[in-house]
Amino acid sequence: MSTLVESPVPSNDSQAAAPAAYDPTQKQKSQAKTARIPIKVVAAEKLKKPEWIRVRAAAPGSRFYDIKRILREHNLHTVCEEASCPNIGECFGKGTATFMIMGDKCTRRCPFCDVGHGRPDPLDTQEPENLARTIAALKLSYVVITSVDRDDLRDGGAAHFVECIAKVREYSPDTRIEVLVPDFRGRLDRALHILNSGPPDVMNHNLETVPRLYKQARPGSDYAHSLKLLAEFKKLHPEVPTKSGLMLGLGETDEEILQVMRDMREHNVDMLTIGQYLQPSEHHLPVLRYVHPDTFAMFEREAYAMGFTHAAVGAMVRSSYHADQQAHAAGVN
């Protein structure tokens, strides 16, 4: 495990141990990424994974390698690969993936996330076409499109999302599209205006954790702003289900999670996902607890009691894991 401490101001004596010169054009992963955030990860005792944490490998004869080949041929990224999702074997094996647009370099440095940080490359104008062709070739009936944060773009990438949605609908008119968007912080009004021209079938934005832990887990993000994004989109598109997700194990309490769920419902969020945080590497935020299945079951009961139309809750649940089944259960056909 690891602990978190505020970064001290380096003294002359510590300059020899300073990290290597930062090259913003290179994708920073793991230690290189987390070395330059205000909260540092310090190695400590590691919690043993309980028996209910089980990752499914790709089955023999599955489409795992076929999917990887197709993605590389079309110059596409998936959050499954970039974020080291534990469910990648199962999802790729079944021929599903969550597509990550606008490159593989994020402008944020969230220390729970394994997506690389760096100065993003210019947008690929061929990406919407490549994405649409790939989805059509795979004959997918439901897709999730997400992205890195693009704080370098005036609209946060909203127009690129709309272009991708339009192209997918052109090639696959019966395919349902869920988007998992960044927070568009500082660009919310512009982004929402752009999304009006081509809204998705499901609008997803993850709160990730409780507000008390935002400084450690989501530097550069704001809890109230993320709730506002979901609420404002819902006002503009009341017919489109909204969705958000949380990860457990960063030091939150059960009551804090329940309060976030109440906040979601007060902001008209329809669908919920809750899963166990798993540390991508020793340089990321530590797992401070492994949540028992009985506790996940309690959160699921409470979610339906609060009025969520669908709640996917469990240790291995991720925001886009079985997203098609989640959406179908919530009435998206």
From Swiss-Prot:
Binding residues annotated for [4Fe-4S] cluster 1, in chain numbering: 80, 85, 91, 320
The keyword Oxidoreductase belongs to this UniProt entry's keyword annotation: no
One GO molecular-function entry: lipoate synthase activity
Keywords noted in UniProt: 4Fe-4S, Cytoplasm, Iron, Iron-sulfur, Metal-binding, S-adenosyl-L-methionine, Transferase
Compositional bias per record (Polar residues), positions renumbered to this chain: 1-15
Family indicated by similarity: Belongs to the radical SAM superfamily. Lipoyl synthase family.
Name of the featured protein: Lipoyl synthase
UniProt organism field: Bordetella pertussis (strain Tohama I / ATCC BAA-589 / NCTC 13251)
Gene: lipA
